[in-house]
């Protein structure tokens, strides 16, 4: 999947072949039974399961075959980037980060793809390839509509009107911006609180690392 996404035809980096082994080690060392991930990671999980099966055939029942835990909402299983094309990826520069402040989120939302362009808001809108509506599908709630856009009861009502025309993409982006920032505000607050005690963060990481080493050592 990664090779296709990056359009590697030749001179494929060794990391593309070795990284699945490294990921499998991170999972199996702790005998994890469930791995929360997006559907783009399903091939990697299958590689891990195959490695576990072959290892256990040789050395006995030592490792555990993990299962993938996908988000309940199908749209969240492979959330596209803000460009509406590839998956959200740091290397592709199409991400909204949990650490982004409100101004940064709005800057990114304004640049989000609306799918097929329209000459005016009176023209019917298009949902296919429209990253704004994909994100609304993933994150908006009926309560968000009641708070920020009471003209519509829910996302389905907005969609019905949007495809008929009369709703500007800018208005939809403003609504999405409100939805995202409402969700991110508590995260920002908590992050700020932790930033005031960096030594404690390192202390937590140290304790976690020690516990992880102990667990992995038992498996090894």
Model-derived features: positions:
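A short glycine/serine-rich beta->alpha loop
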Residues: 7-11, 34, 121
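Conserved nucleotide- and phosphate/pyrophosphate-binding catalytic cores
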Residues: 43, 49-220
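Internal, conserved structured core segments that host functional sites
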Residues: 13-55, 59, 80
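N-terminal Rossmann-like or analogous alpha/beta NTP/dinucleotide-binding catalytic cores
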Residues: 1-24, 143, 179-184, 188, ...
